[in-house]
Amino acid sequence: MEVARDGIMHPVDDFLMVVKAAMLEMMMMGKMAERYYYYVQLAFKMLVGVLKNLPVVYSYRYDAREYITETSNAVLGDDEVFEFGSSGEMVNSFLAFLRRALDWCAKFDEPPDMGGHGIEFMYPTRPTRIQRSTMGYFVRPKVPAAIVADAAVAAANLHFSNQVGEVSVRVPSRDLQPGEAGPSSSGGGRRDPAQANRGPVARVTPFVVERRYEEGEPGENGDESDEDGGRMDGDEDAAQSEQNNDDGMDYESDVTDHSSAWGEEPDRRHDAEAGERGSERSGSNSEADERRRSYENDDIQVDVTSVSEDSESDGDFEERRDARIRGATADAPRPRRGEREEDDERGEGAANDGGRRPARRDSPDSVIVIDDTSSSEDETFPPVLWLQRRDDPRTLLSRTRRAASRTRTIGGTRPRSRSPHRRGEGRDLPEDN
């Protein structure tokens, strides 16, 4: 409850301070006595007397003093006679009286034209802020010394007197922090009791954002950088692709078909097993592991449209096909081939091993070129240049998937749902007897 700067309080606030002081003492003592009931009821009677005896009390519709008397008698009721059969009956009677009194006082918070009590006081008062049907009084507990020092919490005593007597309310408050300005009444940086209702100061820790540069400062060597200062993935792929093209790598010798052209994740198990067998035969696990890691980390997608050889000459067809291949794979990094694989293709590895193992060939045995001469719009798959090994199990897998996809659209049929619970298929419905 705040006190007006000029010291003038609303008469209702005077009554509420007595109620809070009595409730606080009951909570501290852990019990209720008849004297608390008597003090609160006496304070309410004094409030009614003050309101009726004000120099100027104005009402728009009726006599304000007569209206106050009638409504206050309804609040008091028959509780003036303190004859209770038990302590529980006394507590229930006190709570009922307190609820009626608070409802009666809450109407003074409303403006007269909104229906309050229709009464205006012709002197400046501070408005009352209370709840309508209940009263909640919360005391902030003292913070243990293990969490914060006792010097961080100070207590301020608010004293005032009324017709009932002297009222003192102890309000916990916070000490002034170092470097915080404010009036001091008792020295030692303690807060003035009149300003004890001031809330704690919010402490905000600045969040420092550090920019990290993996490849150097932004703009170095003409590379574009993202927000974090690192190089963009697209720039790294383009740089790797340009470096591979400069090295003169043969496309047909190191690009194999993947199921990624069908919109699916490629299966790396066959390549991992082939890399492990090659590392065991070569006796060098480090080179095989390095090649396998570089191959697994790269996602190669090929989408090349071939044309008919009948419409063009052989030279023009080869040049345009190579140009399309380079353009389609310009932004995809390619794995580097080890020297051991090149020796195996030429047969030098088998000669050096003394005939212990046959020569290993990683280049495709055949090149399958799909010639798109059809103008049908029902074609569901674009023409793709297939570069595969005959012993590669992915060859059979990809061809099977393509054949199944083509036959699925014949006759406008849709694939049958695998789940028997969709659209009521496969359900055993009870027979009607």
Curated annotation (Swiss-Prot):
Compartment(s): Host membrane
Lipid bilayer topology: Single-pass membrane protein
Annotated keywords: Host membrane, Membrane, Transmembrane, Transmembrane helix
Domain of life: Viruses
Stretches the record annotates as Disordered: 169-433
Bias (Acidic residues) ranges: 216-227, 234-254
Chief location category: host cell
GO annotation, cellular component aspect: host cell membrane; membrane
Sequence intervals crossing the membrane: 36-58
Composition-biased stretches (Basic and acidic residues): 265-280, 354-364, 422-433
Region forming the signal peptide: none
Keyword Cell wall biogenesis/degradation set for record: no
Protein name: Uncharacterized protein UL-1
Organism per entry: Psittacid herpesvirus 1 (isolate Amazon parrot/-/97-0001/1997) (PsHV-1)
Lineage: Viruses, Duplodnaviria, Heunggongvirae, Peploviricota, Herviviricetes
